[in-house]
A protein has these predicted regions:
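Short alpha-helix in the alpha/beta-hydrolase fold that links the catalytic acid
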Residues: 80, 94-103
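Short beta-strand/loop motif that positions the catalytic acidic residue
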Residues: 78, 84-86, 90
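Active-site nucleophile elbow and catalytic-triad environment of alpha/beta-hydrolase enzymes
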Residues: 54-74
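Catalytic active-site module of serine/aspartate enzymes centered on a nucleophile-bearing elbow/loop
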Residues: 108-145
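Alpha/beta-hydrolase-fold enzymes
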Residues: 1-50
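Nucleotide-sugar-dependent glycosyltransferase donor-binding/catalytic pocket residues
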Residues: 91-94, 121
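Conserved active-site and cofactor/substrate-binding residues in soluble primary-metabolism enzymes
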Residues: 34, 53, 57, 96, ...
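Alpha-helical elements of Rossmann-like donor-binding domains used by nucleotide-donor carbohydrate transfer enzymes
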Residues: 61-64, 100, 130, 134-137
Length: 145
């Protein structure tokens, strides 16, 4: 569809409905009910802050990039220091793929937060604390709080 000028169309079964505004139970974003409800209320007030379904062009670009990321030589060629933090209970993206990518980094580190869902910084404090501890250890000169 991208090739015939329909890249801006939503993927099949997708639409502009804002994700993350349905009920808390069964959501794939966070296990923190307070942050989830707060974010849903914000997006209901201002839908332009939310995300709908991906477009065909976005999905095409993502698939191309994932294929490149899957090549061992790609991650092994990265020389910049990278900290990758992934959610252990992520249902949006592949945590095993992130872990494989991270294992091949020469100058990077990866951390899987067991129990965390997709939106790590919108998670319960126990997961956020693990993220910030890893961040503070990774970034030189980060002040301790």
């Amino acid at each position: 569809m991208r090739m015939i000028g329909r890249g801006g169309a939503y993927v099949p079964t997708g639409d502009s409905s804002v994700a993350g505004t349905e009920g808390f139970v069964g959501n794939v974003l966070t296990s923190d009910p307070v942050r989830y409800v707060r974010n849903a209320a914000i997006m209901e007030q201002e839908p332009s802050l939310g995300l709908g379904a991906p477009t065909v062009a976005w999905a095409d670009a993502a698939m191309r990039q994932m294929n490149q990321f899957a090549e061992h030589s790609y991650s092994a060629s990265i020389r910049q220091p990278i900290l990758m933090v992934a959610a252990g209970r992520d249902e949006v993206v592949s945590t095993p793929a992130i872990e494989t990518f991270g294992q091949n980094l020469l100058a990077g580190r990866h951390l899987i937060l067991a129990g965390s869902k997709h939106e790590i910084l919108q998670e319960q404090d126990q997961y956020r604390a693990q993220f910030w501890a890893a961040f503070d250890a990774f970034v030189p000169g980060t002040p301790r709080f």
